[in-house]
Amino acid sequence: MPLRLPDGLPAIDILKRENINIEDMLAKEDDKRPLRIVILNLMPFKATTETDFIRILSNSPLLLDVNFMKLKSHASKHTPAEHMDRFYHTLEELSKENIDGMIVTGAPVEGMAFEEVDYWTELQEIFNWARENVRSTLYICWAAQAGLYHFYDIPKYPLPKKMFGIFPTIPLKPEQPLFRGFDDVFPMPQSRHTEVRREDIERVDDLEIIAESEESGVAIVRSRSRREFFITGHLEYAPDTLDTEYRRDLGKRDDVEVPKYYYREDNPDKGPLVTWRSHANLLFMNWVSWVLGSE
């Protein structure tokens, strides 16, 4: 099904090199009213994250109009201002439209208290706006922790070592529309230094843990009263993302552990074994079809 994307977005050419011809999927002006999705991209390297989400949303069975949101109170240090001005919009600009779905990405600030993040106040305003005006929101990784803290006062805790790898995860509520077509176990990429804990979430009546891993802990939490999902991992990750992180960290110090269940035979020289892509596509398409696309 077609996508509507900003003209000239670099992700279009990147995906073309992966034999995903986004140009063939681009919507025409006379197409019917699309589902409008806004991605609040908090990651430093914007184009990489844009590509990850467009890659996965390109499988949508429904027409999607995808736009990107930026913060007013924080300037990106790793993405040119020209890129941000051309392809990103503020909350004030996007709030004039009817938004069906929102995705809030992770951010490399998990070592800080939420209140110490320089854009925390603005982020809270966006969270509140999304809750009142958007049909469904996906909060990813740090954003999941931030959303749980903002709405429900759920704390995050430092981990003794980085949760890093592809972890077997169990859908505890397989009847949830998000899990249509899922197996009894699915793999979820994780890359984080902090966690939220089951006991804190279970104290909140409005929250329900719908997926969990024996090794990596809480995986997906949903709001019972709203179409909000808090995902602690990164199903949107490209095949080489954890490899890039591993080699980046290895260049800084020697005590970096190999990401678990990621490389063939646990050997970085043999490359990653991609096991999560089909469930990642399924989860996002279920979100589009059954959560956004249904009244």
Regions flagged by a language model, labelled:
Residues K72-D85:
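N-terminal beta-loop-helix "entrance" segment that forms/cooperates
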Residues T49-D52, H78-A81, F114-E115:
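Short, glycine/acidic-enriched capping/hinge loops at junctions between secondary-structure elements
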Residues G101:
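Short, Asp-centered acidic motifs that coordinate Mg2+ and/or phosphate
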